[in-house]
From Swiss-Prot:
Active site residues of this protein: C107, C203
Entries under InterPro entries matching the protein: MnmA-like, MnmA-like_C, MnmA-like_central, MnmA-like_central_sf, Rossmann-like_a/b/a_fold
Function: Catalyzes the 2-thiolation of uridine at the wobble position (U34) of tRNA, leading to the formation of s(2)U34.
Annotated source species: Pseudomonas aeruginosa (strain LESB58)
Organism lineage: Bacteria, Pseudomonadati, Pseudomonadota, Gammaproteobacteria, Pseudomonadales
EC numbers for this chain: 2.8.1.13
Name of the protein in question: tRNA-specific 2-thiouridylase MnmA
Domain of life: Bacteria
Length: 375
């Protein structure tokens, strides 16, 4: 598909083909670079209700069309059992415990860079490749994970739990490009996915309402909505349907004495099954000075004998925040220079040294910011 014949390489690469434009262009670029390229389409969720919420059939058809266009073989593999055991059951357990998990992070660690990698190696591959917007760099005998070149698409946050050994066996061809360039390449070469919309949301939920999906697996436990002063002002249908900083969907209204400021979720009292709320986008209890994280995964070993100044994200697409990270008896504690809004237990905090993604962990608790004095 390239204008000039590439120099052949011995390495055999199997590309995880999702049916999207990023993996499509990744396969094309690797062909142009002379690799021996094949594709593999993963099915990670079994639709047992007769509907195609994940559009798996359409995605497979698109992946096949791209592979036919560029002249490579497409394998298929079903990792639904591994996904259920290693990702989905954890997802449910976290929601049951009142936290807000991010299944994409565990999916990358357990499925795309473990089950898929192992399967590809079994097929005789030397390397795998994906359409993630990240980069890798070999330095000082180890492989580092770097942010993608396009700051609007960088996905290092979601890959922070993948180890350096797995990164070393992986290629990320679009990590050096910006999204418009990727679409332009796909269009130039007539790929069926050139104008396909990016997938959003969690695969196994698809177009369904999140609350409707969760009700299939976890029984709802309605309870009171209280102000931080202890006044009951409404009812919630289940703590698992709400997250810190949430404004929409609280169903609070008609409180004349409360004024017009919108209500936000400030916290959850799990023992009493109470949702705690307050008014105002800048409510002090929405901000944290520090957090405690556990279940830490480092891409490569990190030296933390003493507190270390780093940068961090507490959510995807957040700008990097200055902090000091230290290891304590309770876990890893990050103290931020500036107040952090809506730090959410169950979500991930990811640490950076410049463009290098060092790793991260799961937020357990957050410490409120004291606006009355020194933080």
């Amino acid at each position: 598909m390239s204008e000039s014949a590439p120099t052949p390489r011995r390495e055999r690469v199997i590309v995880g083909m999702s049916g999207g434009v990023d993996s499509s262009v990744s396969a094309l670029l690797l062909l142009q670079q002379g690799y021996q390229v094949e594709g593999l389409f993963m099915k990670n969720w079994d639709e047992d209700d007769g509907t195609e919420y994940c559009t798996a059939r359409e995605d497979l058809a698109d992946a096949q069309a791209v592979c036919d266009r560029i002249g490579i073989k497409l394998h298929t593999a079903n990792f639904a059992a591994e996904y259920w055991d290693n990702v989905f059951e954890h997802f449910l357990a976290e929601y049951k415990a009142g936290r807000t998990p991010n299944p994409d992070i565990l999916c990358n660690r357990e499925i795309k860079f473990k089950a898929f990698l192992d399967y590809a190696l079994m097929l005789g591959a030397d390397l795998i490749a994906t359409g993630h917007y990240v980069r890798r760099r070999d330095r000082d005998g180890r492989t580092e994970l770097l942010k993608g070149l396009d700051p609007n698409k960088d996905q290092s946050y979601f890959l922070h739990a993948v180890g350096g050994e797995q990164i070393a066996r992986s290629l990320f061809p679009v990590g050096e490009l910006e999204k418009p360039e990727v679409r332009a390449i796909a269009e130039k070469h007539g790929l069926a996915t050139a104008k396909k919309k990016d997938s959003t949301g969690i695969c196994f939920i698809g177009e369904r309402r999140f609350t409707d999906f969760l009700k299939q697996y976890l029984p709802a436990q309605p309870g009171d909505i209280e102000t931080i002063e202890g006044k009951v002002i409404g009812r919630h249908s289940g703590l698992m349907y709400h997250t810190i900083g949430q404004r929409q969907g609280l169903g609070i209204g008609g409180l004349k004495e409360a004024g017009d400021d919108p209500w936000y979720v400030l916290g959850k009292d799990l023992q009493r099954n109470v949702l705690l709320v307050g008014q105002g986008n800048d409510h002090p209890l929405l901000f944290s000075r520090a957090l405690l994280a556990s279940r830490i995964y480092w891409v490569n070993p990190v030296e933390l004998e003493r507190p270390r100044r780093l940068r961090a994200k507490v959510r995807y697409r957040q700008s990097d925040q200055d902090c000091v990270l230290e290891k304590t008896a309770e876990g890893y504690r990050a103290v931020f220079d500036e107040p952090q809004r809506a730090v959410t237990p169950g979500q991930s905090v990811v640490f950076y040294d410049g463009d290098v993604c060092l790793g991260g962990g799961v937020i357990e608790t957050a410490e409120a910011w004291d606006f009355g004095g020194r933080p």
